């Protein structure tokens, strides 16, 4: 059964490594050393719920609810555009230290709300966990399925905590004004690129719904 664990771990790692909104947010919180371990835990727990739902039967709900997928897609587009605008606005601020200080004043609950939006309003998360993992893990017998899910979840926990701790460790080098400007520009551009990609997918999806 251990082979199914490593299959799940490898697939989970392959899907989570690319830089996306969730990884960018965890990295940013790590650099700020602001609730970064709590955010890593909440991201990993969110993945646990999504992965379990996808592998153990939740994929059918998404596949049978095209309007739900469309709603999540356009909600994600709006959020990513807003979040990217905030990052670019901070990067372009004439007083970057003051702008960064304002961001640091964000309370715990606002940070948690942002993390939940970054995770649950990203339709790619549902495609990864419900469609990809659901189709591969869902066809296994119950015992191999559990090991496969455990491997995928382990990859998520290891990645998010590793990313948060690494970013916090590198924080002294990455909290300079120049580094912060580059990071905020990178985060803003990534958020907008993903938003435009989602918008294209959303338009195609809506076109398919009405035809």
From Swiss-Prot:
<dbReference type="GO" id="GO:0015171">
    <property type="term" value="F:amino acid transmembrane transporter activity"/>
</dbReference>
<dbReference type="InterPro" id="IPR023445">
    <property type="entry name" value="Arg_export_ArgO_enterobac"/>
</dbReference>
<protein>
    <recommendedName>
        <fullName>Arginine exporter protein ArgO</fullName>
    </recommendedName>
</protein>
<keyword id="KW-1003">Cell membrane</keyword>
<dbReference type="GO" id="GO:0006865">
    <property type="term" value="P:amino acid transport"/>
</dbReference>
<feature type="transmembrane region" description="Helical">
    <location>
        <begin position="179"/>
        <end position="199"/>
    </location>
</feature>
<dbReference type="Pfam" id="PF01810">
    <property type="entry name" value="LysE"/>
</dbReference>
<dbReference type="InterPro" id="IPR004777">
    <property type="entry name" value="Lys/arg_exporter"/>
</dbReference>
<feature type="transmembrane region" description="Helical">
    <location>
        <begin position="1"/>
        <end position="21"/>
    </location>
</feature>
<keyword id="KW-0813">Transport</keyword>
<keyword id="KW-0997">Cell inner membrane</keyword>
<feature type="transmembrane region" description="Helical">
    <location>
        <begin position="37"/>
        <end position="57"/>
    </location>
</feature>
<dbReference type="GO" id="GO:0005886">
    <property type="term" value="C:plasma membrane"/>
</dbReference>
<keyword id="KW-0812">Transmembrane</keyword>
<comment type="function">
    <text>Involved in the export of arginine. Important to control the intracellular level of arginine and the correct balance between arginine and lysine.</text>
</comment>
<dbReference type="InterPro" id="IPR001123">
    <property type="entry name" value="LeuE-type"/>
</dbReference>
<keyword id="KW-0029">Amino-acid transport</keyword>
<feature type="transmembrane region" description="Helical">
    <location>
        <begin position="111"/>
        <end position="131"/>
    </location>
</feature>
<feature type="transmembrane region" description="Helical">
    <location>
        <begin position="68"/>
        <end position="88"/>
    </location>
</feature>
<comment type="similarity">
    <text>Belongs to the LysE/ArgO transporter (TC 2.A.75) family.</text>
</comment>
<keyword id="KW-0472">Membrane</keyword>
<dbReference type="GO" id="GO:0061459">
    <property type="term" value="F:L-arginine transmembrane transporter activity"/>
</dbReference>
<keyword id="KW-1133">Transmembrane helix</keyword>
<feature type="transmembrane region" description="Helical">
    <location>
        <begin position="147"/>
        <end position="167"/>
    </location>
</feature>
